[in-house]
Regions:
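Conserved active-site alpha-helix within GNAT-family acetyltransferase domains
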Residues: 135-154
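C-terminal "cap" of GNAT-fold acetyltransferases
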Residues: 6, 155-168
Length: 168
């Protein structure tokens, strides 16, 4: 589906990424740490995709320039942040990670991804759940999610970082 004349989105099945796409997703993820959690390896990314329920790629031509990975309730995902929502919500769509290449930010791509996620969640009337780092602070993400209508429902401090939990 086209976002505009320059970019398109592609729904990615959990086993649908080819090796070049996996490498680019991994590289984008690592380039966006600590805003998104670091991945140990491309194998770790593959495991996340296997656990995931809904994923999108943003492409410019054939180049992957952004992605989002989402989980549903009932997953075996071991993330403490995911577990927070599992304890609070019966059904949900959890945004595990989203990243856009720095060169393509402020072009409406984040909004386009979330608009698609909102439409997907609407099918089953699911709340969308996510966390944002508050230490170190990810102010652009906090601002973005506030603007998109997310409400904070909790927070947690870890040994090396802190997060705020949001739903919409």
């Amino acid at each position: 589906m086209a976002i505009n004349s320059k970019f398109k989105m592609l729904v990615l099945s959990h086993d649908g990424a080819h090796d070049g796409q996996l490498q680019k997703i991994y590289d984008l993820n690592q380039a966006n740490t600590p805003e998104v959690g670091s991945l140990e390896s491309k194998k770790h990314l593959t495991k996340l995709l296997e656990l995931s329920a809904y994923n999108l790629l943003i492409l410019k031509g054939d180049e992957v320039i952004g992605f989002i990975i989402c989980m549903r309730e009932g997953s075996d995902y071991g993330s403490e942040n995911y577990k927070f929502f599992s304890k609070k919500l019966k059904k949900f769509l959890y945004v595990d990670r989203v990243a856009i290449d720095k060169k393509y930010r402020r072009e409406g791509l984040g909004k386009a991804i979330y608009d698609d996620i909102f439409n997907e969640a609407k099918i089953e009337n699911l709340p969308i759940a996510l966390e944002v780092n508050t230490e170190p602070v990810n102010q652009p993400s906090l601002n973005f999610h506030e603007k998109m209508g997310f409400d904070q429902i909790g927070a947690k401090e870890f040994a090396d970082h802190s997060v705020a939990y949001f739903i919409k």
